Amino acid sequence: EYQSAQLMAEKGVNVPMGIAAKSVAEAVAAAAKIGDDEVVIKSQILAGGRGLGTFKNGFQGGVHVIKTSQVEEYAGKMLGQTLVTKQSGPEGKPVDTLLLAKKMQLVNEMYFAIMLDRATLGPMIIACSEGGTSIEDLAASSPEKIIKVPISIGEGITDAMTLPLM
């Protein structure tokens, strides 16, 4: 997530302030640099459903909105631990990086991803206008709300491909 935000920011996309941290001390420093009373602390793993996940140490949730004074405690419970989500499988994924992000007041939350699709053996844009917290559940209950656009490796993303996303 933090790598994607960095790439988008480099291309002029407005993204919330976020700082990656690989230690508790770095997490505390990141929260101080953000400078707000509250921050969002997010486990960085290659699996979705982090907010609803459970760490093998019993700690609940891989994404939290917390007071800056709680960063040391939460980072200590998350870093170096294994997070189990619906997408990770029962073995889970180790958390070696956290993203500390500025808390935003959301007016509208959307989901957008580019993933490798097994069916088409290529990249696929996945988008939804109804947020991304439980995208898997939404896809199961209302699949018509999920927009899927296959990307040709030869052509890349064209203007025509983006029309369904508007």
Regions found by a protein language model. Give the residues of each.
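Active-site nucleotide/adenylate-binding loops and adjacent lid/helix of ATP-dependent enzymes
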Residues: 1-166
